[in-house]
């Protein structure tokens, strides 16, 4: 892995992206990650590119002692201060459907999931729009949300009986076609599928420019190209911020 990406011994990338020599490197580099440091990076990017989009791939309102005791409110408060433009979901649903609805209804940003369906009627859940448009840098961008597809298998279904999930490649294709028909010049899939599932989706669904991949905690220093789609794996636990600069010309992604 380190040879493939040209990662030097003892470098920050060696520490952040590899478990080899972790103990000795930890003594040199110390604590990594945390939303305070994420905020520092995000603020620096926004100062450089005020038109940047900030997207959150989920697993955000769960996983810590304070999160458990506040039903996710501590993380909701921090993320509201960070001001992302959109998010999608996985472990958030283990707060229970009512609590998720309570939080989502008060969010100042988009809560997206093209594959979150009403379990009784097998139609898209009204609380979670499939996509949202953004105008940035003179480009019309569509962000399509993709929540974790295997929710009732990986987590207790009684916590969210109102919803069904699944990969729903065909519906994703329909959403891509829909936003393209509405003038989207760039299509971003904000996904919690997992890296391998996202690569598979990229090979099946046409018209997606970028997949921001979550769930499997993979952290890669470069995007992976699948056909005409780049797949970006951004790690986990607040240790990484992935910055993707795109060259969009005449409604097409020409480079990154």
Predicted regions and their residues:
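Acidic, metal/ion-coordinating pockets
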Residues: 1-256
């Amino acid at each position: 892995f380190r040879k493939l990406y040209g990662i030097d011994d003892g470098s920050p990338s060696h520490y952040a992206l590899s478990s080899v020599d972790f103990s000795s490197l930890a003594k040199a580099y110390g604590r990594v990650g945390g939303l305070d440091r994420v905020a520092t990076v995000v603020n620096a990017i926004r100062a450089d590119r005020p038109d940047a989009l900030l997207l959150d791939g989920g697993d955000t309102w769960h996983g810590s002692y304070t999160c458990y005791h506040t039903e996710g409110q501590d993380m909701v408060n921090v993320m509201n201060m960070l001001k992302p433009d959109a998010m999608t979901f996985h472990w958030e649903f283990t707060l229970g459907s009512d609590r998720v609805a309570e939080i989502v209804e008060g969010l100042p940003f988009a809560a997206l999931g093209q594959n979150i369906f009403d379990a009784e009627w097998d139609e898209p859940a009204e609380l979670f729009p499939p996509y949202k448009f953004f105008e940035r840098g003179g480009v019309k961008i569509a962000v399509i949300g993709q929540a974790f597809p295997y929710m009732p298998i990986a987590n207790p279904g009684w916590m969210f009986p109102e919803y069904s999930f699944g990969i729903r490649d065909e519906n994703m294709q329909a959403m891509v076609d829909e936003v393209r028909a509405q003038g989207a010049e760039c299509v971003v899939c904000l996904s919690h599928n997992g890296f391998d599932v996202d690569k598979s989706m990229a090979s099946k669904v046409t018209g997606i420019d970028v997949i921001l991949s979550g769930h499997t905690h993979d952290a890669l220093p470069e995007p992976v190209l699948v056909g005409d789609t780049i797949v970006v794996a951004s790690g986990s636990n607040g240790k990484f911020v992935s910055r993707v600069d795109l060259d969009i010309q005449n409604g097409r992604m020409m480079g990154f």
